[in-house]
Every structure is written in structure tokens, then in C-alpha cells.
Amino acid sequence: MDARTGALNLGNLEMIYELHGKIPQNSSFVYSEDVLTSTIFGNLRYLNSNSVLNSFLLKAIDFQNNNFNFEFSKDLKFHFWRKYSSKTTVQINEPDLILEDENSVLIIECKYHSFLDETFSENKSEYTNQLLRYSTIINDYYSNKKNKNIIFLTLKDYEVKECLEKTRMKLPEKIGLYWLKWEELYSCLKEYEKCNISTGEKNLVNDILQFLSIRKLKYFSGINISKNNFSWKYKRNYKYKFASKFDSFTWRYNYE
């Protein structure tokens, strides 16, 4: 058993409490983006492959609707809430997550129910925010990396256009800026679930899927009915049976 597989149970512990309804709905734990960040990414790192993480990140888009197109190697490092002192100011910056391999660095700022920290001067001529401050971390500490990017991770309904436009205008061109939605992860895990993975991984993936469902962090697929979806069958003794087949389930009704 390799180190990542051996750590599955340990990495899974922090969300078991919530999956079994042990957390009050009004608890600050439920609304904490730090808890969400550590639960999701803390558990993804224990999968034997980075394929789920990479497929999730590939769903991030920039202002031209181009997808994030860098995949991390197996030698990926996760840095949670690491503190960085600026080399030009006295400010300390603490990104939610930094992903790093030999050639790439990615800073992920995770939001759940809070907003991006923005600062304006009195006459609003000067503007900065968390993402811009994090770009100085890349310049100061990761300038040797070939691929340098920032992802803003939010709920699907988060209004990002204005703040990201302001950010892109002031961000160095060599640093990519992307937007990603928490809801995109669910389908990535469902695809991975179909692969030939170990029992431990299946259990972990299932737990994360349940967690995302509880938090309502998945897209509603909806139901679309057309007359072509219905089939009628006549059975003896005046029993009629019809079925409607949808993408995700089959609904049946029997009338006698």
C-alpha cells in the first residue's frame, strides 16, 4: 500500500462528522470556506492519481472563455494557508492553496459565502485585491516557474466579472487569471468513479460526492420529457404499463 492510499482514512475523517448529520445547520462550520477548502482539496490529494484534480482545474476559464490548460505532474505539492511576506511591503499574504510542481505554480483563492477582499484609495484611483496581492507572491517566490496562474474558485452564482476585469488590467501578463466554480467538481468525481480504482478510493470518492450533495455543490440536471420518451405496453388481464426513460433514472407506473 502506498503512502497516499494508506492515508485515505485519515484524510477522510474531517467530513465524516458532517455526512452523518452531527453538525447543526446554523453552525459556522457549515459556512466556513476554510473548512470547505480543506475538506475538498485535503481529500483530493489522497487519491492515487491527480486526474480528478486536473480535470476539475481544466474547467476553469479566462475572459476569452479559454480553459485552463496545464496539468500537474505526480510530484505535486499542496501548500495550505502558507504565509508569505512581501519583499516590497510589510504585508503578509496567506493564500488558501498553492499547487506546485517542477514547472508550474497555481494559487487558488477559495470563496464560499464571502466576498473577495478589495481595497480602494479615497479617490478610487488606486485599487488592489487579494488576487493582485497574491501575484506578488508569484513574482517574489516562484519567478522561476514556467507556468504561473491564479484561479478564483467560487460558487456558480458569484458575481466575478467586475472584480476580475479590474484584476486582469493590473495583473502581469505572464500570470494567467481564471475563474472556476465549486459545482464543476461533482461531474469530475463521477467520471473517476467509473475507473478501475481501489476500494479505498471508491469509498473516499463516494464520501466527497455525498459531501458535495449535502452542500448543494452540484448542478441540477433537470428533467426533459418528450413524447418520444414514452413507451406503452399492453399486458393481459387489462394491465397497462408505461415507462419514461430519462438520462439518470427510469420512472415506471403500473395501472391495473
Range-by-range predicted roles:
Residues 1-256:
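Charged, terminal alpha-helix-loop-beta segments
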